[in-house]
Amino acid sequence: MSQKLQKPSFLSEYLRSIRLFSKKCVRPSGKELSMSIKRHAIGIGFLGILGYAIKLIHIPINNIIVSSPGKE
């Protein structure tokens, strides 16, 4: 019986600690947030372009390696 009573208190204590932690956290300003979003977007775009370029280069190389000269 006492274990059943402790579970909700554990959960409420955990939620209370989460609320206290989130209140103590320093949140970024709007300018910092927009700058961070722009940098992440540029990084993701760069990785996409890099992946596309690597794929574009390796497809012809793979076709040259895989294809045999006797087949037509």
From Swiss-Prot:
Any one of the GO CC terms: endoplasmic reticulum membrane
Cytoplasmic side: 1-40
Membrane topology qualifier: Single-pass membrane protein
Compartments (UniProt record): Endoplasmic reticulum membrane
Keywords carried by this UniProt record: Endoplasmic reticulum, Membrane, Protein transport, Translocation, Transmembrane, Transmembrane helix, Transport
GO biological process, one term: intracellular protein transport
Parts of the chain on the Extracellular side: 62-72
GO molecular function: protein transmembrane transporter activity
Transmembrane residue ranges: 41-61
One Pfam family here: SecE
Subunit organization: Heterotrimeric complex composed of SEC61-alpha, SEC61-beta and SEC61-gamma.
NCBIfam families with a match to the protein in the record: secE_euk_arch
Family according to the record: Belongs to the SecE/SEC61-gamma family.
Task performed by this protein: Necessary for protein translocation in the endoplasmic reticulum.
Name this polypeptide is given: Probable protein transport protein Sec61 subunit gamma
Organism: Encephalitozoon cuniculi (strain GB-M1) (Microsporidian parasite)
Taxonomic lineage of the native organism: Eukaryota, Fungi, Fungi incertae sedis, Microsporidia, Unikaryonidae
